[in-house]
């Protein structure tokens, strides 16, 4: 992170969290959940420049793309959303793009917060059906 934060360059940051993974593990077993994560990670890796995707938790990933134009970054995000746009498994995505890496920690916090808001919205939409817990 330090290597980016000193640069005066554009940067896109995204947090991705796979919604419904616990339910998939409970219903189909952890092998199915692991396969989903491996497949999803491979798809994400093919969607972003090499070396910019990081797994930060069980089902959480972060993307940090320096030197990327805003339109290109939005295309990357849309491709990721489309990949995980399934009723049984959607990804919560929060992202930020900025002209400067100077305040990278604040950008990361904002993208993370937006991901949690997206995740909460997903679970609220499915709460009445009793489909998901978190």
Q: How should these model regions be labeled?
A:
Residues 1-12, 19-46, 54-58, 62-63, ...:
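Conserved long alpha-helical elements within nucleotide-processing catalytic cores of c-di-GMP signaling
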Residues 11, 28, 94-96, 125:
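Flexible, nucleotide-binding loop/lid elements of kinase catalytic cores
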Residues 14, 64, 94:
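Conserved Rossmann-like nucleotide-binding pocket used by diverse enzymes
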Residues 63-68, 97-99:
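Short beta-strand-to-loop capping motifs
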Residues 74-81, 85, 96-134:
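Catalytic-core segments of nucleotide cyclases and related cyclic-nucleotide turnover enzymes
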Residues 87-92:
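PAS and PAS-like sensory/regulatory domains
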């Amino acid at each position: 992170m330090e290597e980016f934060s000193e640069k005066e360059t554009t940067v896109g940051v995204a947090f991705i969290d796979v919604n419904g993974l616990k339910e998939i593990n409970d219903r189909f077993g952890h092998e199915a959940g692991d396969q989903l994560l491996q497949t999803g990670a491979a798809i994400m890796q093919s969607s972003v420049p090499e070396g910019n995707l990081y797994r930060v938790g069980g089902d959480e990933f972060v993307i940090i793309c320096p030197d990327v134009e805003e339109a290109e970054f939005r295309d990357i995000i849309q491709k990721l959303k489309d990949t995980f746009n399934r009723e049984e498994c959607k990804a919560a995505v929060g992202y930020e793009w900025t002209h400067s890496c100077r305040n990278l920690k604040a950008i990361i916090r904002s993208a993370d917060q937006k991901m949690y808001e997206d995740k909460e919205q997903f679970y609220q939409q499915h709460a009445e059906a009793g489909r998901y817990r978190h």
